Curated annotation (Swiss-Prot):
It comes from the Bacteria. It comes from Methylobacillus flagellatus (strain ATCC 51484 / DSM 6875 / VKM B-1610 / KT). A motif ('KMSKS' region) lies at residues 241-245. Pfam families: Anticodon_2, tRNA-synt_1c. This is Glutamate--tRNA ligase. PANTHER family: GLUTAMATE--TRNA LIGASE, GLUTAMATE--TRNA LIGASE, MITOCHONDRIAL-RELATED. InterPro entries: aa-tRNA-synth_I_cd-bd, aa-tRNA-synth_I_codon-bd_sub2, aa-tRNA-synth_I_CS, aa_tRNA-synth_I_cd-bd_sf, Glu-tRNA-ligase_bac/mito, Glu/Gln-tRNA-synth, Glu/Gln-tRNA-synth_Ib_cat-dom, GluQ/Sye. Keywords: Aminoacyl-tRNA synthetase, ATP-binding, Cytoplasm, Ligase, Nucleotide-binding, Protein biosynthesis. Monomer. GO terms for biological process: glutamyl-tRNA aminoacylation. A motif ('HIGH' region) lies at residues 9-19.
Length: 467
């Protein structure tokens, strides 16, 4: 058997974290078994589906590197096929027309709720031996309902949750085509999985209740039943269902926030799955190790600190050239153009060990390419009357030296010693004048990257105002 998995999002919004994890697990299982991974866009909700959402899904998949072997297939382009299968079910007695009006169904629901019963369709239009059906009304277009078995149980061995059994008497007759002829979600999913030869359906556990209905439909069609694996939901840091209030939930928002795709993938892989104590691994390793026996059936909890830790690791490991291309774009988006005057890769190398996102690096290094606006409080704190003469003398001495870290440190240390000061008394005001902040890497390293001309110009502009 060739493994065939699928990821089937609805384009009613962005690709969210839960969907991305489902896609990752489906992709990894196909890759592990040298199978095929199919991308299917379930766009039958015409009112809510948008081209922008489709593009966001495709962008998210591509950014993560989750390549698909077939597709993307669009359900709206398969309407003729669905109608053929509906006709087959009607012809074979597995489906029937139901002429209930909305008012009838609402009244039935209200009555059942008053009687403490579970609201469900009562089968009044279901054809059965010896049953007399109501007269067909002239003014009500019918829906098509699937004739769900009345007896027995639907049993499947869920690859994550174990054996699940649902009594058929708990299931009513599912609408598979609306009054306007359009097929419904549960029906389209079944036909697609059948036609595409899906062997393993990996999806969120919010679909567990759909599974018995879909199995019954597949059996009526004489189709092979795929294996099902229902993944637990993802909770936020606070133990509540992950939502926008927990921060970014869109995959592309993580890209915008400065996360690397390999960090996001590594983190998603560990949401509900484990391989011993391994925390950091490549996607090749993940595909090799992946299996359902290591997926927990309990809810996974999102931990932003862990994601940041992983992202920091991958930033440290990434090629500087790759980071430079990305960070240059982030700076450009902020209106800051990177020039050849300052070595961007050298600047990133100076800052990446202290950053957990690319945005942090971009924000920290902006001063290399645009002179900072220095807060008055910093000037007041560090450029004190007693230190200004020292800085003025240091400016003169720095004009004619070799511009290396070693020589800069020597000259700054000389000013410290000559004036019987501690090193920070000189280094901190220098840092403020050059970077606009009292937080930065070693000041001599910053000065080398800024260059002699720019470093002296920044010192001079501050001292001219404050001396």
């Amino acid at each position: 058997m060739t493994v065939r998995t699928r990821f089937a999002p609805s384009p009613t919004g962005f690709l969210h974290i839960g969907g991305a994890r489902t896609a990752l697990f489906s992709w990894a299982y196909a890759r592990k078994h040298a199978g095929s991974f199919i991308l299917r866009i379930e766009d039958t909700d015409v009112a809510r589906s948008t081209p922008e959402a489709v593009q966001a899904i495709l962008d998210g998949m591509r950014w993560l590197g989750l390549d698909w072997d077939e597709g993307p297939f669009y359900q709206m382009q398969r309407m003729d096929r669905y109608k053929v299968v509906i006709g087959k079910l009607l012809d074979e007695g597995h489906a029937y027309h139901c002429y209930c009006s909305r008012e009838e169904l609402d009244a039935l629901r209200e009555q059942q709720m008053r009687e403490g019963k579970k609201p469900r369709y009562d089968g009044r239009w279901r054809p059965e031996s010896g049953k007399v059906l109501p007269a067909i009304p002239a003014d009500i277009p019918p829906v098509v309902r699937f004739k769900n078995p009345r007896a027995g149980n639907v049993v499947w061995n869920d690859l994550v949750k174990g054996e699940i059994s649902i009594a058929n008497e708990e299931l009513d007759d599912l609408i598979i085509a609306r009054a306007d002829g359009t097929p419904t979600y549960n029906f389209c999913v079944v036909v697609d999985d059948w036609d595409m030869g899906i062997t393993h359906v990996i999806r969120g556990d919010d679909h567990v209740n759909n599974t018995p209905r879909q199995i019954n439909l597949l059996q009526a069609l004489g189709a092979t039943i795929p294996q099902y694996a229902h993944l637990s939901m993802i909770l936020g840091d606070d133990g509540q269902k992950l939502s926008k209030r927990h921060g970014a939930v869109s995959v592309m928002q993580y890209h915008e926030d400065g996360y690397l795709p390999e960090a996001v993938l590594n983190y998603l892989a560990r949401l509900g799955w484990s391989h011993g104590d391994d925390e950091i691994f490549t996607m090749s390793q993940f595909c090799e190790w992946f299996g359902f026996d290591h997926i927990t059936p309990s809810a996974a909890q999102f931990n932003t600190e862990k994601l940041n830790w992983l992202n920091a690791h991958y930033i440290k490991q990434a090629e500087l050239g790759r980071l430079a291309v990305d960070i240059a774009k982030r700076l450009a988006d902020a209106g800051i153009q990177v020039s050849d005057r300052v070595d961007l890769q050298g600047v990133i190398a100076l800052y990446r060990d202290r950053a957990s996102t690319l945005n942090q690096i971009a924000g920290s290094i902006a001063y290399f390419y645009r002179r900072p606006n220095i807060e008055a409080s910093l000037l007041e704190k560090y450029l004190t009357p007693e230190i200004l003469p020292v800085l003025t003398a240091l400016l003169e001495e720095l004009k004619d030296i070799e511009w290396t870290r070693e020589k800069l440190h020597e000259v700054i240390q000389g000013a410290v010693t000559q004036n019987a000061l501690k090193f920070p008394k000189v280094a901190m005001p220098l840092r403020v004048m050059l970077t606009g902040s009292d937080q930065s890497p070693s000041i001599d390293a910053v000065m080398v990257l800024l260059g002699q001309e720019e470093s002296l110009a920044r010192m001079r502009s501050v001292l001219q105002v404050n001396v």
